[in-house]
Amino acid sequence: MNAATKLPTQLGPIHFTGIGGIGMSGIAEVLLTHGYTVQGSDLKPSKITERLERLGAKIFIGQVGENLADAEVVVISSAIKPGNPELETARARGLPVVRRAEMLAELMRLKSNIAIAGTHGKTTTTTMVATLLDRGGIDPTVINGGIIHAYDSNARAGAGEWMVVEADESDGTFNRLPATIAVVTNIDPEHMEHWGSFERLKDGFHEFVSNIPFYGLAVCCTDHPEVQALVGRITDRRVVTFGFNTQADVRAVNLTYKSGVAHFDILLRNEGQVISGCTLPMPGDHNVSNALAAVAVARHLGMKRDEIRAALAGFAGVNRRFTKVAELGGVTIIDDYGHHPVEIAAVLKAARQASEGRVIAVHQPHRFSRLASLFEDFCTCFNEADVVGISDIFAAGEDPIPGASRDDLVKGLIAHGHRHAVAVPDEDALEALIRAEAKPGDIVVCLGAGTISTWAHNLPARMG
């Protein structure tokens, strides 16, 4: 029995189908760190698979039944569907098949856990909680949904008693995670293909916070009306609220931005104290809000005000969350994962705060179904951008939906009053748009969950 995980040490090779996925790889890395034999497959090599290989994992490119070899357990994510050759082989051999969330729950079982949930901001908030606890000497284990710049990984195996995890609501499995502290950043209609209705999604979040033990804590953002409504439904559990509103227990005040750095004070209402002179080296009210969630957790775990102030000031960020790719002739290129209208609006507001020049947004819509169901919101979320470029939709396996195309969105933006929206069909068109529109002092924000990140990172070579 492994002392750290209480999983049997004699457990043979653990095979991850889709090991390069951001959710799967973190679990694989923690298991590797604890001495388990880990192997896995993915459809193509990546920096993540290369890192896991360096840590000792055996990596297969492509997915065939023979990859399982002498594996004794197979871990899959919700993206792995019936018919996958490795899944079918595992079942034919009678091997245990474990969902990603189930394996994560096993790792969490004998730790005290902080689980961060919400439609937006999970990854950044998870990173901030990890950063603060690391700085406070709590030495947490971390499994995140994005690459933490300070670790150059989405995972960290700590020696402390606390684990920090990103809790993904997309398939409902976040309710299997044994959270001691449950954080909710916001609740918006998303992942309706699983939940079916917004009411069911809200019930899922209620179950998430209701699952905490009597000695646990719910940390909730009451700036968001649906989260405030959730707080009203929580009974018999401790709740700490955060936000900019006057009623919040942990509240940011005196917020200003200078050269893309947030300056603010934090009121700790329940303690009657202030953490003054805080800085966060990234723009965006939403990022300050995420920081407040981390501060609420840190104070609950006994961190000192000076430790919190220093940790926020040194926050190194997370990959694809307002990540600066390059500065080309005085034009800043930003790569961001934002693909929901709420996220896009928040990122563009942050870009406006960070730049004295114009904001040029280039967005790759992610999934036809998302664009179709939120079309009106997509048509109005780019108001902070002076210029908007829209690429072809990243289908993620979906079939096209009438009325939800690149050109439909461009027309919708113009019809809703945007002054400059154009189609950007390929990387050549992106380069041409930047050369024509961007001037020194401007900021170009590439937004989306698909291949737009590659476009952004290719710009320095193309523009050079």
From Swiss-Prot:
Record GO biological process: cell division; cell wall organization; peptidoglycan biosynthetic process; regulation of cell shape
Residues annotated to bind ATP: 118-124
Cellular localisation: Cytoplasm
SUPFAM superfamilies per UniProt: MurCD N-terminal domain, MurD-like peptide ligases, catalytic domain, MurD-like peptide ligases, peptide-binding domain
Pathway terms, separated by semicolons: Cell wall biogenesis; peptidoglycan biosynthesis
Keywords assigned by UniProt, alphabetized: ATP-binding, Cell cycle, Cell division, Cell shape, Cell wall biogenesis/degradation, Cytoplasm, Ligase, Nucleotide-binding, Peptidoglycan synthesis
EC number assigned by the record: 6.3.2.8
InterPro entries assigned to the protein according to its UniProt record, in alphabetical order: Mur-like_cat_sf (IPR036565), Mur_ligase_C (IPR004101), Mur_ligase_C_dom_sf (IPR036615), Mur_ligase_cen (IPR013221), Mur_ligase_N (IPR000713), MurCDEF_pg_biosynth (IPR050061), UDP-N-AcMur_Ala_ligase_MurC (IPR005758)
Gene Ontology CC terms: cytoplasm
EC category name: ligase
UniProt GO molecular function: ATP binding; UDP-N-acetylmuramate-L-alanine ligase activity
Catalytic activity as recorded in UniProt: UDP-N-acetyl-alpha-D-muramate + L-alanine + ATP = UDP-N-acetyl-alpha-D-muramoyl-L-alanine + ADP + phosphate + H(+)
Chain's role: Cell wall formation.
Similarity annotation: Belongs to the MurCDEF family.
Entry protein name: UDP-N-acetylmuramate--L-alanine ligase
Naturally occurring in which organism (per UniProt): Dinoroseobacter shibae (strain DSM 16493 / NCIMB 14021 / DFL 12)
